[in-house]
Design a protein with these regions (language model features):
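Positively charged n-region of N-terminal signal peptides that target proteins for export
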Residues: 1-4
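A short helix->beta-strand "capping" segment at the edge of beta-propeller domains
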Residues: 19-36, 273-286
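Surface-exposed loop/turn elements that mediate protein-protein interactions on large endomembrane-trafficking
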Residues: 20-29, 58-72, 103-115, 149-166, ...
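Catalytic phosphate/metal-binding cores of nucleic-acid and nucleotide-processing enzymes, i.e., regions
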Residues: 38-39, 44, 51-57, 88-90, ...
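Carbohydrate-active catalytic/glycan-binding domains of CAZyme proteins
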Residues: 75, 170-175, 182-184, 195-196, ...
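Hydrophobic, aromatic-enriched interface-forming segments
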Residues: 123-181, 433-455
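Short beta-strand elements that form the blades of beta-propeller/WD-repeat-like
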Residues: 48-53, 86-97, 132-142, 183-191, ...
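Hydrophobic h-region of N-terminal signal peptides that target proteins for export
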Residues: 8-17
Length: 584
């Protein structure tokens, strides 16, 4: 069995080895590490794969980056080390056990617990050389200190004493990560100054510091077995969190993804031997999407999807963008808009990106944080269901490129600030720019579709808003005088015969749905009607785009509930002149 595992590792090594002797980066698969708690604390490896520790447990991934198995830890798990078919982990207990605050725990390669030892202090950093377990102690916290305490014990948990080590520089906390090359111990720690993370190399007796090679290894590193990547010199890997602040992973908008980089230790320093490729693409089913907006970038020959982010996400409230060449596989997100803190934004809704007069404009609805501003008044009296009415409206942002960054362009929400509004979209008629938006049912009971002309520079409204129609005018609306009616997600389209059509959403018996409505005059002022339901499978907030090859498509999110299950659905469409049809 062992020979089979070594053979499998060798095959993987061949696939990862670049022609010039470097090693291609290993990427984990988006979505497979969604159970991570906090960030990666430590790492170790064997011929079977790589072990990544986090506050809540361990992930075991193959050398191809795919998740093999995982286990949980009911305490805060820090760094881990590997030796002789065992994984050794340093744990900090949330509640002391018999007065003990720390623990060394041991797992087999299938992540079954096979032993543990309580310790009096908080521990982090863990490695094994020969028959000795090394672990870091942290009696300092952020207090500056020159050395760190490192404890030792035998494999059967006999205490071998604690040594005060001198790392050669000011640091804070204790040793964060450890690795061993079979002869020496390498300790990663947070230092004061630049760089913020350093590494120190010690002889096994810890009395002599043999150098401070430069390596950023705060999220774990380990030596690679010769069976995986044969080399004259020891080779190590480091863990790198992709896509921003690893303390704010979000399974849908910022899924955890890790990249392993590779280093060779020779002449007292770590030398980068990594060939960094591109992360694997993910499909539309792998990330949450509410109110998706797709822009066809013909110059770049790709598609850009713009999606909301919240104040709890990694980058805060704003808009992120992904790219695709086939509308199925998408890149990791990049943040293209961050809402200024003064707006007190909890989340951005319905971001739309439009090219206009050589610039790129983002229409984004800002929903403010609870209690940040006085609640908006009810404008429709009566005994109908009323819910919270936070300040909400559509702002305009501008950039020189569809890649952003988008910065605030309008000084205030384009619709009246005392209205509860959302989902502003862009339309140009007879050379004049307009915003079409929804006046929310939460304030007026019967949601309205409203338009307002914009100034030529799109900085503000150029006139008074005018109503287009109300949600209650759709044929399947409830006749009850106290019923509420939703308007949502308008998008305007000029058909092949010159008809002006609007796609929009409301509710129906089967949930969320899509309507198409025609202007009887072909003008924005209408009148508008009738309203034809063309999709009723709990999906909506429609928009239209054409593929690079010219095919008309509709993008919606489906389902509408629950929130975390929303995904982008793309449907081919038929332009029928006076209406639109899904091409089934």
């Amino acid at each position: 069995m062992k020979n089979l595992l070594i053979f499998a590792a060798a095959l993987c090594a061949v696939a990862l080895q670049a022609a010039d002797g470097r090693i291609r980066s290993v990427y984990t698969i988006p979505g497979e590490l969604n159970d991570i708690v906090g960030h990666v604390q430590g790492a170790a490896c064997s011929t079977q794969g790589v072990y990544l520790s986090h506050a809540g447990g361990i992930f075991k991934i193959g050398w191809d980056g795919r998740l093999i198995r995982k286990c949980t830890a009911p305490v805060h798990l820090g760094d881990i080390g590997y030796a002789n078919g065992r994984i050794y982990g340093a744990l900090a207990l949330r509640k002391p056990i018999d007065g003990q605050k720390g623990m060394i725990r041991v797992w087999d390669e299938n992540l079954n617990i096979v032993g543990e030892k309580l310790l009096p202090g908080n521990v982090d950093g863990c490695a094994v050389i020969g028959g000795t377990i090394y672990y870091g102690l942290d009696p300092y916290g952020k207090t500056p200190h020159r050395g760190c305490k490192i404890g030792r014990m035998s494999l059967d948990f006999k205490d071998l004493g604690v040594v005060d080590t001198d790392h050669g520089g000011q640091c804070h906390y204790g040793v964060q990560t450890m690795a061993a090359d079979g002869r020496d111990l390498f300790c990663g720690y947070y230092s004061f100054g630049n760089p913020p993370v350093r590494c120190a190399r010690f002889a096994p007796d810890l009395r002599v510091c043999r150098g401070t090679p430069m390596l950023s290894c705060s999220e774990g590193f380990g030596m690679i077995p010769q069976e995986v990547f044969p080399s004259e010199h020891p080779r190590f890997f480091t863990v790198n969190a992709l896509n921003g602040n690893c303390h704010k992973w979000h399974a849908m908008t910022n899924p955890p993804q890790i990249r392993l980089d590779f280093y060779e230790y020779r002449n007292g320093q770590f030398h980068d031997v990594t060939e960094r490729g591109t992360p694997p693409l993910i499909t539309r089913n792998d990330f949450r999407a509410s109110d998706p907006f797709i822009y066809t970038d013909r110059a770049a020959k790709l598609y850009r999807i713009y999606l909301q982010t919240h104040d709890t996400d990694v980058y805060g409230a704003g808009v992120q963008m992904r790219t695709s060449k086939d509308l199925l596989h998408w890149s990791l997100p990049t943040q293209v808009l961050r809402v200024p803190a003064k707006r007190k934004c909890s989340s951005v809704w319905a971001p739309e990106m439009h090219a206009y007069n050589g610039k790129y404009y983002m229409f984004a609805t800002i929903s403010t944080q609870k209690g940040a501003f006085p609640e908006l008044p009810v404008l429709e009296p009566g005994d109908w269901k009323k819910i919270a009415r936070p300040k909400r409206g559509t702002w305009i942002y501008r950039a020189d490129s569809p890649e952003g960054p988008f910065t605030e362009w309008s000084a205030e929400s384009i619709p009246p600030p005392d209205w509860s509004t959302l989902d502003g979209t862009f339309w140009v008629e007879d050379g004049k720019p307009y915003m079409v938006f929804c006046h929310e049912w939460t304030q007026v009971r019967d949601g309205r579709m409203v338009a307002v002309q914009l100034t030529p520079d799109l900085k503000s409204a150029a006139g008074e808003p005018f109503e287009l129609f109300r949600a209650s005018s759709r044929p399947d609306a409830k006749p009850d005088a106290n019923a509420t009616h939703v308007t949502d997600g308008p998008f305007l389209y000029r058909s092949h015969n010159g008809s002006l059509l609007m796609l929009w959403s409301s509710t129906c018996k089967t949930g969320y749905c899509v309507y198409v409505t025609r202007s009887e005059t072909g003008k924005l002022t209408g009148p508008w009607g009738p309203h034809e339901r063309i999709f009723d499978l709990d999906g909506g907030h429609p928009m239209l785009f054409r593929t690079i090859h010219g095919q008309l498509m509709m993008a919606i999110h489906q389902p509408n509930k629950p929130w975390e299950k929303k995904r982008t659905r793309i449907l081919p469409m038929l332009d029928m002149g006076n209406t639109l049809r899904i091409d089934e």
